[in-house]
């Protein structure tokens, strides 16, 4: 029975992933809680604009644990290796990489006794993508549109001024090329949730995914300012650099803390974008993906070995990320 459940996706991968786009008499309910309007969904998932000022980025330090740093590395990497994917897909795929890495680490250090679901064959039949050393099972989001309708595109074409036959042919060739390169949006499949659902009495028939909303929320709250950085601007007792931010004498509101974390995320995303951009000019997408994990390992926060370091936090100097950039020739 379990083997049959593992292979269930072979029988219904296309049908399951296209439910939201199927025509119905009544207004269809959103799949996985997402709005039916793809453009609105993508707008709601937008991350802070990356800070690309090298001086600002190079002087910044963030305080975090390893998992959200993996997530940030992966979601920015996919911006370069899979640029045709919407942000919802990049967040879902990056969360898949992060969760799979955390699961393997937990098993390795002995705090989780169950083997990773992918090693037991769960998700067999779903397409595979290799991202930062991980083989991620994905589900195609058939029919998902997020960049505007063909009617809008056609209206733009009609509104353009008359052009020569040669220019028309050139425009048609460019349009055909864009159509060929357009990717089908993807979800990362949550194999651990799939195993849990299929081995429980009340298992769901849906193929579970990593929700983009959860990945975004994780990123938005994960990057604190080290204590030593806060001390420079606030009247607080001196603490050792690298510890959690101390409580200042003047109360810091939740809104202030959230804005600070968002700013730190902007700085981190900027550092990663500058790193990937420097190498994307000389490496193909596969080679860029292969190097990403090694770059992460070189800058990840130092924590205690084994179970003692699980969830541990430390400082990440963004200048260390910038130092990994390719030197101009």
PLM region descriptions:
Residues 1:
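Basic, Lys/Arg-rich alpha-helical nucleic-acid-recognition elements, primarily the DNA-binding modules
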């Amino acid at each position: 029975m379990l083997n049959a459940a593992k292979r269930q996706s072979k029988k219904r991968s296309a049908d399951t992933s296209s439910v939201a786009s199927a025509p119905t008499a009544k207004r269809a309910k959103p799949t996985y809680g997402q709005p039916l309007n793809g453009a609105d969904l993508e707008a709601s998932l937008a991350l802070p604009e990356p800070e690309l000022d090298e001086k600002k980025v190079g002087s910044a330090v963030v305080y975090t644990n390893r998992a959200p740093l993996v997530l940030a590395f992966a979601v920015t990497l996919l911006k370069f290796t899979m640029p045709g994917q919407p942000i919802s897909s990049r967040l879902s795929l990056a969360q898949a990489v992060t969760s799979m890495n955390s699961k393997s680490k937990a098993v390795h250090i002995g705090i989780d006794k169950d083997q990773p679901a992918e090693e037991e064959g769960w998700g067999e039949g779903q397409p595979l993508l290799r991202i930062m050393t991980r083989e991620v099972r994905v589900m195609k989001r058939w029919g998902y549109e997020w960049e505007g309708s063909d009617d809008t595109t056609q209206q733009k074409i009609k509104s353009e001024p008359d052009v020569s036959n040669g220019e028309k042919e050139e425009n048609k060739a460019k349009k055909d090329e864009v159509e060929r390169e357009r990717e089908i949006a993807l979800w990362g499949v949550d194999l651990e949730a799939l195993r849990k659902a299929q081995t429980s009495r009340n298992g769901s028939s849906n193929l579970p995914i990593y929700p983009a909303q959860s990945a975004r929320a994780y990123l938005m709250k994960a990057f604190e300012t080290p204590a030593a950085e806060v001390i420079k601007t606030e009247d607080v007792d001196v603490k050792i650099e690298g510890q959690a931010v101390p409580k200042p004498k003047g109360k810091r509101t939740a809104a202030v803390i959230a804005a600070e974390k968002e700013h730190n995320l902007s700085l981190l995303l900027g550092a990663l974008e500058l790193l990937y951009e420097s190498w994307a000019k000389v490496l193909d997408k596969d080679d860029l993906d292969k190097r990403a994990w090694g770059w992460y390992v070189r800058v990840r926060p130092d924590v205690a070995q084994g179970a003692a370091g699980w969830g541990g936090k430390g400082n990440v100097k963004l200048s260390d990320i910038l130092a990994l950039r390719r030197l101009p020739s």
